[in-house]
Swiss-Prot record:
It comes from Phocaeicola plebeius (strain DSM 17135 / JCM 12973 / CCUG 54634 / M2) (Bacteroides plebeius). The active site is at E167 (nucleophile), E172 (proton donor). PANTHER family: GLYCOSIDE HYDROLASE FAMILY 16 PROTEIN (PTHR10963:SF55), GLYCOSYL HYDROLASE-RELATED (PTHR10963). One of its GO terms (molecular function) is beta-agarase activity. This is Beta-agarase. InterPro entries: Beta_agarase, ConA-like_dom_sf, GH16, Glycosyl_Hydrlase_16. Keywords: Glycosidase, Hydrolase, Signal. Substrate binds at residues 78, 87-97, 101-103, 197. Its EC number is 3.2.1.81. One of its GO terms (biological process) is carbohydrate metabolic process. Belongs to the glycosyl hydrolase 16 family. Cleaves the beta-1,4-linkages between beta-D-galactose and alpha-L-3,6-anhydro-galactose residues in agarose. Cleaves agarose in a random manner with retention of the anomeric-bond configuration, producing beta-anomers that give rise progressively to alpha-anomers when mutarotation takes place. Pfam families: Glyco_hydro_16.
Length: 316
C-alpha cells in the first residue's frame, strides 16, 4: 500500500513539474493570445498535454517525447469507422509537424460498410490515429493549428469520453473537391455528439451554423488555420477560427435536448484524439478516396503544426 501511494505521489509530482516547466518555456503559439475570455479573477494556464511537435517520431519507433503525451492509436481497440483501418505506422512527427497519412495496399481487406439503410463491401483505407495520455475537462480551451488533407477523407481533432458517450468536435472537415453535396473544403464541422450506446442513439446539432463557412470563400485545405473550442461548462461551447469567435451554443435545448445525459450536459473527462477517417456515410456514397487519388501521398496527409490546451486558474 505504501509503495502504491509513493508511486501515485511521484507521478503527481512529475506532472506538476512538467506543467511548471511547460509554462516557463516559449512556444510558437505564444504570438496568439487565447481568444476566449478567462473571466474575472481567472487566467489561462498552459496544460502539459500541449504539443508543438518539434521533435522526431518515426512511423515504426516514435520515441520517448511522443509517447510521453500520446498513444499512436484510438483510445480503445476499435479500428475506425469502416472502411477506415487505423494503423500505428501511418502516424509520424517530422519537420515540426504531426503527420497522419492514408494508403490502400493491394492486399488490404474488404470491410463491410453500413450507413443507415445502405450496406456495401469496400476495400479498407489505412490511416492513423493518436490519443492523448491525459484527459481534459471543462473549463478548458483546446486549439489546433492544422492543414486539412486534400482528400475526401475527414481530417479530425476532437475530444471523446472514455465510454464513448460524450464528444466535442474541434476540427472535422473534408479537404477534397468531391464534396458530395455541401460538405466541401469551404466548411468546418463545429459540433458535438451525445450518445446512448444501448440501444444506440446519437444526438448532434443540425443547425446550419454547425457547418461553418466564412464570407471569404476560404478553402481550409489551402493553408494552416487555428481552430479551437472553449468548453466553458456542461452547457456552453464556444468555437474559434483563427482567433475569431464564430459559433456559440449554450443551453440544454441545443446541447442535450433529448436528455441523453440525464440533465448533466457535457460533464465527463475526455481524451483528445487526432486522426483521419474514411467515414462510412461518405464511403457508401462513393466518396472513399480512389486508389489513384491515394497515390498522391501529400494530398492524403493531415498536418498538425501544434495543439495547445489551457485550463483556468485563479489569478495570483
Amino acid at each position: 500500500m505504501k509503495r502504491k501511494l509513493f508511486t501515485i505521489c511521484l507521478a503527481s509530482l512529475q506532472f506538476a513539474c512538467a506543467a511548471e516547466n511547460l509554462n516557463n518555456k516559449s512556444y510558437e503559439w505564444d504570438i496568439y493570445p487565447v481568444p476566449a475570455n478567462a473571466g474575472d479573477g481567472m487566467v489561462w494556464k498552459l496544460h502539459p498535454q500541449s504539443d508543438d511537435f518539434n521533435y522526431i517520431a518515426d512511423e515504426k519507433d516514435k520515441g520517448k517525447e511522443f509517447y510521453a503525451k500520446w498513444t499512436d492509436f484510438y483510445h480503445n481497440h476499435w479500428t475506425g469507422p469502416a472502411p477506415t483501418i487505423w494503423q500505428r505506422d501511418h502516424v509520424s512527427v517530422s519537420d515540426g509537424f504531426l503527420k497522419i497519412r492514408a494508403s490502400r495496399p493491394e492486399d488490404v481487406p474488404l470491410k463491410k460498410v453500413v450507413s443507415g439503410p445502405n450496406t456495401k463491401e469496400l476495400p479498407g483505407t489505412y490511416t492513423g490515429c493518436i490519443t492523448s495520455k491525459t484527459r481534459v475537462k471543462y473549463p478548458v480551451y483546446v486549439e489546433a493549428y492544422a492543414k486539412l488533407s486534400n482528400s475526401t477523407m475527414a481530417s479530425d481533432v476532437w475530444m471523446l469520453s472514455p465510454d464513448d458517450t460524450q464528444e466535442i468536435d474541434i476540427i472535422e472537415a473534408y479537404g477534397g473537391d468531391r464534396d458530395g453535396g455541401g460538405y466541401g473544403a469551404d466548411r468546418l464541422h463545429l459540433s458535438h455528439h451525445i450518445f446512448i450506446r444501448q440501444p444506440f442513439k446519437d444526438y448532434q446539432p443540425k443547425d446550419s451554423g454547425s457547418w461553418y463557412k466564412d464570407d471569404k470563400g476560404t478553402l481550409w485545405r489551402d493553408d494552416f488555420h487555428r481552430v479551437g473550442v472553449f468548453w466553458k461548462d456542461p452547457f456552453t461551447l464556444e468555437y474559434y477560427v483563427d482567433g475569431e469567435l464564430v459559433r456559440t451554443i449554450s443551453g440544454k435545448d441545443i446541447i442535450d435536448p433529448n436528455n441523453y445525459t440525464g440533465g448533466t450536459g457535457l460533464v465527463k473527462d475526455m481524451d483528445i484524439i487526432i486522426n483521419m477517417e474514411d467515414q462510412s456515410w461518405r464511403a457508401v456514397k462513393g466518396l472513399s478516396p480512389t486508389d489513384e487519388e491515394l497515390k498522391n501521398v501529400e494530398d492524403h496527409t493531415f498536418l498538425v503544426d501544434w495543439i495547445r490546451v489551457y485550463t483556468l486558474v485563479p489569478e495570483e
